[in-house]
């Protein structure tokens, strides 16, 4: 019996110690969990977003565009309309209705609805910035704020070459504007937050980092100097905000690389500094009045540097300086390498073009020039464009895709097609590079102002008389 009592006493002592240890371990573990939770508590973007979201708007577009469709089988088309051999040269049929119109195609106005995003940048004036491709061909623009308020909006200015547009909300009060950050200070790896209206869902937020800076060569816009981010950007995000963790605007979301139509983590935004420079011109002039450096150039790569025996790896190689241009008067020469602009490194010709393309006429800037192994700085004042080139879409929203300039060649005045983009309204009408518009609706065109005055009257049909080489043809837009 005594032996049993001893055993029982030992068991009770063991259980007491075990229970005591378990309680002690449990309390210690509970305390440790509390400490870990407090340390690992993730920061939230909510406070920043609460400040930023009221400045981001959803945009609803009602518009129309001209659609050209063929009435004849492809094999018969060469025998009809202005391209027919019966309509060329001194043919007696050249000015007939048969040749003046294009019986091969039907033209019709097709209505459409589109969605996009925008960002309020001036609360007092109710100005918001978005992409040009969001509002082009718009007949009606309606915006919705984060608090549900809706307003009509009108276009203040737009620029198809950079894909930036400035709109104004009508009769809008008590708005919240975003601050535009200095995008020149951005670094690869900085955190980004994209805000917009993808697929019409309304306010949507995604996050990521800056994957690359100064992206170009994408053939999305004429002036390309994109911020690349892996923050998810989808359809409807165009024109929306790309912000930093302070809630400052660093870019306007513009495009994605999407082989299958969806986000794969490669999105592009127009830098905030370019947005600021262009919208300031739109407020002042109603359009972008670019200065021109007056050079022709190319990217500097290792092969070119080796052949030219240039001790430089990055920059904009100057292959030609146009007479009487800004570059000419600053002493820039063919063979020079432009390596900086206002002390900011220039890594490519595309980057130089984008930087200069956002600056207005009469801007003075400092260029770093590498020549004969020595870098020196020169001051350049931007002159007006020698070609006075503008986008046809900027003066007439019904036809996009052609760059125009005043022309006077061998006594023939008119408006010259400097460039043409494939699969645009201008190319479908039939315009080609180097065409010269000499008449519209039987009214003589001597310059861009003449063309703009006729297009501003918004006629139901446009019959363009065009000089193409030694031939005269007619192109029709209905």
From Swiss-Prot:
What this protein is called in its record is: Probable periplasmic serine endoprotease DegP-like
What's this protein's family per the entry?
Belongs to the peptidase S1C family.
Keyword Signal appears in the UniProt entry: yes
* Stretches the record annotates as Serine protease: 116-254
Record-listed substrate binding positions: 236-238, 293-297
Q: Is tRNA processing one of the keywords? A: no
What taxonomic ancestry is recorded?
Bacteria, Pseudomonadati, Pseudomonadota, Gammaproteobacteria, Enterobacterales
Q: Where is the active site?
A: 133 (charge relay system), 163 (charge relay system), 238 (charge relay system)
User: From what organism does this protein derive?
Assistant: Buchnera aphidicola subsp. Schizaphis graminum (strain Sg)
Q: What is its EC number?
A: 3.4.21.107
